[in-house]
Design a protein with these regions (language model features):
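Duplex nucleic acid-engaging cores and interfaces of nucleic-acid transaction enzymes
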Residues: 1-186, 190-192, 199-200
Length: 200
């Protein structure tokens, strides 16, 4: 993995032969194993994850689709059938409603980002040339993003969005309750009261 990652020279298959043993049967297995290790390295890079997170925060869209065959059952969620909007602009009450729809098995939510922009950023971070070893690194980066980084960042972004939506909902409820508790019981009508404890 270090040999490929260094991206010096293209005699990778020749150099991979010394890693063939009882556990690693072929040169191809050795190269695949090395690419898996590189994918892990990319995934564990805090800098790489921060770049991906930044792109998602700016451009990720929340895609909401109705589960096939659930159109009638989930009619109350019909406003959200087959919609797409930027996650950062999604109102808290809409997000919470969509999440309820997903929990009830009516809606399916996904985050969609510009994968080509993400991969371009990652390539710039790790790929140093255009030879065979660099192409292998590019392949490992793509695998790392699709298999490891993307699912993790999507879960993180959705959890953060839900947490913020919950906070907004609680604040709104508290504000409405406060107004209700402090409102006069009979509105603007005048009330005459007698205090039985008052002595003359």
């Amino acid at each position: 993995a270090k040999i490929i990652m260094s991206q010096h020279g293209d005699d990778i298959e020749y150099r991979a032969r010394k890693f063939v043993n009882d556990n690693v049967k072929t040169v191809d297995d050795a190269i695949l194993g090395a690419k898996d290790i590189i994918a892990e390295w990319v995934s564990e890079s805090a800098n790489a994850r921060n770049r991906v997170r930044s792109i998602y925060a700016r451009t990720a869209s929340l895609v909401c689709k109705v589960v096939k065959g659930k159109e009638l059952e989930g009619e109350k969620f019909s406003n959200y059938f087959n919609t797409e909007e930027l996650l950062k602009r999604c109102a808290s009450h809409r997000l919470l409603a969509m999440l309820r729809g997903e929990a009830e098995g009516v809606l399916k939510l996904n985050l969609k980002a510009d994968d080509s922009e993400v991969l371009e950023k990652l390539y710039k971070m790790f790929v140093k040339g255009s030879g065979m070893s660099s192409r292998m690194v590019s392949s490992a980066i793509e695998d790392s993003y699709k298999r490891l980084i993307k699912p993790s960042i999507e879960t993180e972004m959705m959890n953060a969005a839900k947490q913020e939506a919950d906070r907004v909902a609680i604040d709104t409820f508290a504000q409405n309750l406060r107004q209700l508790l402090f409102a006069p019981p009979l509105g603007k009508r005048r009330v005459l009261a007698i205090d039985p404890g008052y002595r003359t």
